[in-house]
Curated annotation (Swiss-Prot):
NCBIfam families tied to this protein: gatA
Family membership noted in the UniProt record: Belongs to the amidase family. GatA subfamily.
Assembly, per entry: Heterotrimer of A, B and C subunits.
This enzyme's EC code(s): 6.3.5.7
Coiled-coil blocks: none
Keyword Ligase included in the entry's annotation: yes
GO cellular component: glutamyl-tRNA(Gln) amidotransferase complex
Protein name: Glutamyl-tRNA(Gln) amidotransferase subunit A
Catalytic residues of the enzyme: 68, 143, 167
PANTHER family: GLUTAMYL-TRNA(GLN) AMIDOTRANSFERASE SUBUNIT A (PTHR11895:SF151), TRANSAMIDASE (PTHR11895)
Catalytic activity: L-glutamyl-tRNA(Gln) + L-glutamine + ATP + H2O = L-glutaminyl-tRNA(Gln) + L-glutamate + ADP + phosphate + H(+)
Keyword annotations from UniProtKB, A to Z: ATP-binding, Ligase, Nucleotide-binding, Protein biosynthesis
Record-linked HAMAP family: GatA
Gene: gatA
Length: 477
């Protein structure tokens, strides 16, 4: 972005209408910024004055981007990927959007997503499946599918999304881009539709780590309107200090139990990675982690996240806001009205997950399921954070396999194992994690490298990710 490789004018001169066509064809787009005259067919003309009056002091001046459609934008339709909010116009804007606007970034659209973020494939939006940027028969990953696609296809140089389990990092792995989830609370969640507030993070997609650092300087700010907001010790230092060399030897760790599950492609690439690090005289420490604990990560995640989600969206009644069924000749009470509206306008997958959350938090089941899940989460977090007493960074593949087919996902075939589930620990702990391009078998068969760090070590994490990008030539076309 700093070198103007991907300027607004270059993007729009090349494909002013094609952007809209491409986004629509793969269901990556939900809503253009129509109410603010951000129609793409007119964007070159509308922004030409801004471009001519560009101010280099504004960090993201004239840089286009997209927002995941669960981030509120005042008077611009924000759906959360759900028919329930098909025409919803928020009366407020999210803090992260306001920060981007203040720094000159130009919103060109809202990106499709799994309904309210409850999905890991990009297949569960009311507005259609988002397919892989290189293969229409494969998934893009989710829930931030449209956001990843827009960056992968060079439609925009960066996008803002959310990550509750691995919703940024898994699509980044599948789409061969960089996906960054900072420490919990460093990017404000004010104005962001919740999924599971104890695990929700706002994060960034880009093609390069340097661009992630630039955007981080804009959006990582303490926000008094967000009770969970935390102040970073490195505000405004992410880009300027990105290439500063480390003054001491870095200790890398990896989970030894995961290696047994690597397929042949992963094993070969992983062996090469270990060999290269050792040749560079970096410590690579095998770490033990109870396999039985790894096996329960996904179950614990589902119990807690679905339970929090059903609470967060209890306000979806269709009475105060949202879609509603009009049956004037069919009188009904409050409960019947809500039931009818939810049945009509919420997706089947979302309703299934809400049922699980409601079951786990029912008075009869609360202690048996939800409270027990919270206790196990605490054990998982303690074990995970203890890893950083021995190492500075934990490395792992960002996925166990290449992108699944849309057909397999729709047939409910399993597509993850504990290699994938490991990414969820960073959400449990609130620690920073990043996925960078790594294993490229073909353009539609990629797996990222996941790098995790301790809480508030975000600057160091970006520095080491940048180092990997340079050392292993992980930049991509």
């Amino acid at each position: 972005m700093r070198s103007n490789i991907l300027s607004l004018r270059a993007i729009l001169d090349k494909k002013p209408s094609a952007i809209n066509d491409v986004l629509t064809s793969i269901n990556a787009k939900i809503e253009l910024n129509k109410s603010s005259n951000f129609l793409l067919k007119n964007t070159v003309e509308i922004y030409s004055k801004k471009i001519n009056k560009s101010d280099e002091k504004i960090l993201l001046n004239n840089i286009p981007y997209v927002l995941k459609d669960n981030i509120a934008t005042k008077d611009i339709v924000t759906t959360g990927g759900s028919l329930f909010l098909k025409n919803y116009l928020p009366p407020f804007s999210a803090t992260v959007f306001e920060l981007l606007e203040m720094n000159g970034a130009l919103l060109v659209g809202k990106a499709n997503m799994d309904e309210f973020g409850l999905g890991g494939t990009g297949s569960y939006s009311a507005f259609g499946v988002v397919h892989h940027p290189e293969n229409s028969s494969l998934i893009a990953g989710g829930s931030s599918s449209g956001s990843a696609y827009a960056v992968a296809k060079d439609i925009v140089p960066f996008s803002i999304a959310t990550d509750t389990g691995d919703s940024i990092r898994r699509p980044a792995s599948i789409c061969n881009v960089v996906g960054f989830k900072p420490t919990y609370g460093l990017i404000s969640r004010n104005g962001v539709f919740p999924y599971a507030p104890s695990m929700d993070h706002v994060g960034i997609f880009a093609k390069f780590v340097s661009d992630i650092a630039i955007v981080s300087d804009v959006v990582i700010k303490h926000d008094k309107t967000d009770f969970s907001s935390q102040k970073s010790p490195d505000e405004n230092q992410f880009f300027n200090e990105l290439a500063i060399p480390f003054t001491r030897s870095i200790r890398f760790g990896y989970l030894k139990p995961l290696e047994k599950l690597f397929n042949k492609h992963l094993q070969k690439k992983w062996n090469n990675l270990k060999k290269t690090l050792e040749q560079k005289n970096y410590q690579l420490i095998p770490l033990d982690f109870d396999v039985e604990l790894l096996k329960v990560i996904d179950s614990i995640y589902k119990i807690i996240s679905y339970s929090e989600a059903v609470s967060c969206y209890s306000n979806l009644t269709g009475i105060v806001f949202g879609q509603k069924v009009f049956e004037p000749n069919s009188p009904s009470n409050f409960d019947q009205t809500i039931t009818r509206n939810r049945d009509q306008f919420l997706g089947k997958q979302l309703k299934r997950r809400f049922v699980i959350g409601a079951f786990a938090t029912d008075e009869k089941n609360f202690e048996k399921y939800f409270e027990k899940a919270q206790k196990i989460r605490r054990v998982l977090v303690d074990n995970f954070l203890n890893l950083f007493s021995d190492v500075d960074f934990v490395l792992s593949p960002s996925a166990s396999c290449f992108a699944s087919t849309i057909e397999d996902i729709q047939a409910n075939k399993p597509y993850t194992n504990i290699i994938d589930d490991f990414l969820q620990l960073a959400n449990f702990a609130g620690s920073p994690s990043i996925t960078i391009p790594w294993l490229v078998q073909t353009k539609d068969q990629t797996i990222g490298l996941s790098i995790s760090a301790n809480c508030f070590e975000d600057k160091k994490l970006l520095q080491i990710a940048y180092w990997f990008e340079q050392l292993f030539d992980l930049n991509h076309d």
